[in-house]
């Protein structure tokens, strides 16, 4: 089966079912006549921006959606995987990350400055990132975007 068709089937399954594990997804694919290895399925999941969301102590697969966010999908994945919390203070956003990931996010945000004039710069420590925004409103919007990514 061609990759594009397989990706469409995966989209349909994840959209219409609460999938808790890759094995469950793999089993539902097999029911539809799609045999896929775990490695291929993992690549497909990344390609489709499917993440594990948590709700009431349960983890399940869902699409990383941006809503009205101006944050690109690669950066959204960084936020989802590395950010612990975000809080705006005036025109600043203080982002707590997993240890060692603040500089990764800082570099990714710095790369966005050409397309996002609301981000002026970043300063990163080991687990904290300070984002300097053009205004308090811009900081509040960025914080809301990050929280939306984290909470869905």
Swiss-Prot record:
Any one GO MF annotation of this record: arginine binding
Subcellular location: Cytoplasm
InterPro entries: Arg_repress, Arg_repress_C, Arg_repress_C_sf, Arg_repress_DNA-bd, WH-like_DNA-bd_sf, WH_DNA-bd_sf
Keywords assigned by UniProt, alphabetized: Amino-acid biosynthesis, Arginine biosynthesis, Cytoplasm, DNA-binding, Repressor, Transcription, Transcription regulation
Domain of life: Bacteria
Source species taxonomy: Bacteria, Bacillati, Bacillota, Bacilli, Lactobacillales
Organism from which the protein derives: Lactococcus lactis subsp. cremoris (strain MG1363)
Family of this protein: Belongs to the ArgR family.
Keyword Coiled coil included in the entry's annotation: no
Pfam families linked to this entry: Arg_repressor, Arg_repressor_C
Protein name as catalogued: Arginine repressor
Entry GO terms, CC: cytoplasm
Role, per record: Regulates arginine biosynthesis genes.
Pathway: Amino-acid biosynthesis; L-arginine biosynthesis [regulation]
Record gene name: argR
């Amino acid at each position: 089966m061609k990759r594009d068709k397989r990706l469409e089937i995966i989209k349909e399954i994840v959209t219409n079912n609460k999938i808790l594990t890759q094995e469950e997804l793999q089993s539902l694919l097999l029911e539809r006549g799609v045999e896929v290895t775990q490695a291929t399925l993992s690549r497909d999941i990344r390609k489709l921006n499917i993440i594990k969301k948590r709700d009431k102590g349960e983890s399940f697969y869902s699409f990383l959606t941006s809503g009205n966010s101006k944050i690109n999908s690669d950066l959204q994945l960084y936020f989802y995987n590395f950010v612990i919390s975000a809080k705006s203070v005036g025109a600043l956003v203080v982002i707590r990350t997993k240890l060692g990931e603040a500089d990764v996010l800082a570099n990714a945000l710095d790369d966005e400055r050409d397309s996002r004039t609301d981000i002026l710069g970043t300063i990163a420590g080991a687990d904290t990132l300070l984002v300097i925004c053009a205004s308090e409103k811009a900081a509040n919007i960025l914080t809301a975007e990050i929280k939306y990514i984290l909470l869905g």
